[in-house]
Amino acid sequence: MKSVLHQIGKTSLAAALSGAVLLSAQTTHAAALSVSQQPLMLIQGVAPNMLVTLDDSGSMAFAYAPDSISGYGNYTFFASNSFNPMYFDPNTQYKLPKKLTLVNGQVQIQDYPAPNFSSAWRNGFTRSGSINLSNSYKVTIEYGRGYDKESTIKADAAYYYDFTGSSSCNRTNQACYTRRYVSTEQRQNFANWYSFYRTRALATQTAANLAFYSLPENARVSWQLLNDSNCNQMGSGSSSGNCFSNYLRDFTGQHRVNFFNWLEKLSVNGGTPLRQAMTRAGEFLKKTGVNGPYAYRPGTQTAPEYSCRGSYHILMTDGLWNNDSANVGNADSTARNLPDGKSYSSQTPYRDGTFDTLADQAFHYWATDARPDIDDNIKPYIPYPDQANPSAEYWNPRNDPATWQHMVTYTLGLGLTTSLTSPRWEGSTFSGGYNDIVAGNLSWPRASNNDSNNVYDLWHAAVNSRGEFFSADSPDQLVAAFQDILNRISGKDLPASRPAISSSLQEDDTGDKLTRFAYQTSFASDKNWAGDLTRYSLTTQDKATVQTKLWSAQSILDAMPNGGAGRKIMMAGSGTSGLKEFTWGSLSADQQRQLNRDPDRNDVADTKGQDRVAFLRGDRRKENSDNFRTRNSILGDIINSSPATVGKAQYLTYLAQPIEPSGNYSTFAEAQKTRAPRVYVGANDGMLHGFDTDGNETFAFIPSAVFEKLHKLTARGYQGGAHQFYVDGSPVVADAFFGGAWHTVLIGSLRAGGKGLFALDVTDPANIKLLWEIGVDQEPDLGYSFPKPTVARLHNGKWAVVTGNGYSSLNDKAALLIIDLETGAITRKLEVTGRTGVPNGLSSPRLADNNSDGVADYAYAGDLQGNLWRFDLIAGKVNQDDPFSRANDGPAVASSFRVSFGGQPLYSAVDSAGAAQAITAAPSLVRHPTRKGYIVIFGTGKYFENADARADTSRAQTLYGIWDQQTKGEAAGSTPRLTRGNLQQQTLDLQADSTFASTARTIRIASQNPVNWLNNDGSTKQSGWYLDFMVNGTLKGEMLIEDMIAIGQVVLLQTITPNDDPCADGASNWTYGLDPYTGGRTSFTVFDLARQGVVDSKSDYSYNKQNVAVSGTEQKGLGGLTLSTNEQGNPEVCSSGECLTVNPGPNTRGRQNWRPIEGKN
């Protein structure tokens, strides 16, 4: 069997345990990118403590469950999964566990060797003993306590029994079973089961192995057993016997390998002293010092001890506690004050009538502050909010409001389900008889030493510690249970819950000089990832722009009748429109299979797909039942998608007409004057939405690339670390000519939502058509579609979508994709070179129209390795008289499109230490002051991997301006190898708090060093400039990830600085207005910091005894900048937090862009 080999990388717990990342972990390579499925500004960066307790009692040697069937080992039906759930199930795939080794300091993972059917190991971990399953097989009853016990039935070829009787047939009636010999196709699966799953111990070893092998490196893990004296002390560091140094350490390197070695060598014997194990785990959390659970780097560095670090205990057993003691009294029935000042009085579902139970211990270690000397900053986990009744919310055991250092315990019982009858177990912690406990109709059974009621104590303990209980009876259920526990922990390692965050502001074109309108998107993680699109009117009051709310798409959609039955939700189809309704009956068999998966149970197949379709359409009847989550609104979170408005024609007629002389743009534009306006925006509910100007949803589209994870939106755990991105890209709208007519086309991208692009013809909003979709099946080098596409007319006479290939593609390459707008065919893929073994991908391009005729000539884009590339989109004729001619050069010219400069970058961005600086935002272009070529302005920074959530204060990110002199269509076979030494440095010299006409602001002042472009003889002296994002040499982790705006003699940009406190979420933003020709301070005032509606000296700052222009100001809001015009006709730049009037400078040259045809998006 082919093994899977890869290395482990760092990521966040929540991301690593989300389904998509977990499933892909087996095939990723060493340098794989960890694309976050959480908004990074909400992620807190402290990994949890995970304490693992496994049962090594003698009963773990049993090859059956439950204990009550022990006397049936010599009966035929003992070999039936229907009677003995531990036995081979032909419908289950028994995966090989993973073998971890340390090679040259790197953890390597591969499958354990597959057992041979004719010589299968009795223990696949130790590869000891063997049996020929083709002729010498006997059913195992017990294995692993120094002796083996097998059925007395005669040895034979491996077999199993199917239950073939009627439903009334007694399960101990041998006539109800039919013997099946293992077929040739089943042999490997049976051998895997025999060697790695057939006993409780083997199944536990394998299940834990498969769950933990993909756990991220920054999780901190310790382990213990119940009995083994060498390994029954949590975090002791014991290396005796087979404990392999169980100190609490980061789950990396040798410590990671030690954990799997410990699993491999598990031996069984003795009783079930669970309470002592619980005590050891709880008391360990009180430990101080370098080996304590809150040490910064356990074993190396104690301080700082982060007060937001959660701690989780996983307790697995197959039996009932016995032969031990606890000393906490009747903790769950005794009144007490909690560390946050709340008072507890005996109440359901916590209380019972027994002392010193496992449940008492669990409550004690939840309610006690393990480290009162540390601040209480654990994040509350409230997946079931109840604003109307805060007390009920606090005491709901599904929530964990504790902010103090405490222990949450997850319990896992093996082979115990049939004993859970009163209260009745129905598959999950908070269902079945649990409701009778809450209502007071039942009490928790009294637990005592070796009592059969102790099985309920496992359930009760999970409730008391705000964890969960899992009951498994078969190996496959055990594998799923371990994985579910890690998924639940990842849900508590969730992004911070935040109220509505405004993420984008976009004006529309339906207003006039007196009233303007704008759309604002927002999301609220504290409301189960609710999203909204709000329309505002914009007016000026007291010289400031005032927003007046007109409607909320969220409210209108939630008020929709009939559970979403009337919504027009479309997906790819085969009709003339290329679309079909999203209904259960319209789905293919494979699509129905994808929706028939339970996201809360590791995608186990179920039959709820039709209900999931109804849920996604807006039907709310299944919420908070049937394991479907509760939504605060139907509209999902809108985080990175900026709305695009479509009303009148996109271009000015006199500019558009010459591009396509055969088309009559004026006629098209006249027809669009009466087109019903629409606003389109993507949301993380799986859809692109279209709304009219009254806020009614008129259209929604589900891209094929997100379909495979639509079912996750129904998950109970979605409110935590299970959040996913879907249609998170900003739609791009443009008018284009194809098929003999003008059309209005929308290009959609997904960002972290998936690897896909789509094009819709939205010319007629009542008759939208799907032009095409592109995914990895069509283009393997397509990664997550973070880059923003551009629609352009090219020299081959075709309209095209030009975009970067995105990140985390199959081969981690970077390439410019040129896609035929009409058909979706890849016209050209221009692949660039890069460093091998380092992930790469091309970011958003900026197109240049050198002669302003509306046809793109060049494209500029950066990549993750810090290279700035130029692409020539012109014919390859060196002596062509007019390489930029609008004339159609014919389809063949596309073969001449190429990577400029002989395949070399225009510039490679590195910091002062020589480390590459990733480029993820589109460059901006301005004409060089000499009128020769462009200054290509770009910034560096990356903000989409989990590790990017925390500020990197070890290095600076940078804004560059690089002179590209070879822009006359010449055959540019090479470019000068530029370094920082060829550039003029600018600096941020001052950050200060100041007041401008009663408006308080924090501002920055940049240097104003001139750039000496030319020597006296006309040769090049300096080739550009750079500005490191740091104030007076202080690094804050500031970076540029949003597109810039070049207007007149100023370049406007917004940076982001992640929070450098790992116990805090959020990010800060700075808006800059700089001189694009020098990268420094402008000679004129840029921002209306005094909020007057005009820009004058009242917004200047006194610096070095003179009034100077402010270079940057801190602003609230996310999503980059939008350029608009205020009521006085002056330009203004808007973030999601506020709008600032800007001055583009004296004798402005107007907007610099790739072409004079401007879209409204």
UniProtKB/Swiss-Prot annotation:
It comes from the Bacteria. The keyword Calcium applies. Residues 617-619 are annotated as: Integrin-binding motif RGD. GO terms for biological process: type IV pilus-dependent motility. It is found in: Fimbrium; Membrane; Cytoplasm, Cytosol. Residues 1-30 form the signal peptide. GO terms for molecular function: calcium ion binding. Ca(2+) 2 binds at D849, N851, D853, V855, D857. Disruption phenotype: Pilus assembly severely impaired. Retraction-deficient. Prevents incorporation of PilE into pili. Residues 1136-1161 are annotated as: Disordered. Keywords: Calcium, Cytoplasm, Fimbrium, Fimbrium biogenesis, Membrane, Metal-binding, Signal. GO terms for cellular component: cytosol; membrane; pilus. Ca(2+) 1 binds at D598, D600, N602, D606. InterPro entries: PilY1_beta_prop_dom (IPR008707), Quinoprotein_ADH-like_sf (IPR011047). Belongs to the PilY1 family. Involved in pilus assembly, twitching motility and adhesion to host cells. Primes type IV pili (T4P) assembly and is required for inclusion of minor pilins PilV, PilW and PilX to the surface pili. Stabilizes assembled pilus fibers likely by antagonizing retraction mediated by PilT. Calcium-binding and calcium release by PilY1 seem to be essential for twitching motility and for regulation of pilus retraction dynamics of PilT. Interacts (via C-terminus) with host integrins alpha-V/beta-3 (ITGAV/ITGB3) and alpha-V/beta-5 (ITGAV/ITGB5). Residues 598-606 comprise a calcium-binding site which together with the other one (residues 849-857) seems important for interaction with integrins of the host. This is Type IV pilus biogenesis factor PilY1. It comes from Pseudomonas aeruginosa (strain ATCC 15692 / DSM 22644 / CIP 104116 / JCM 14847 / LMG 12228 / 1C / PRS 101 / PAO1).
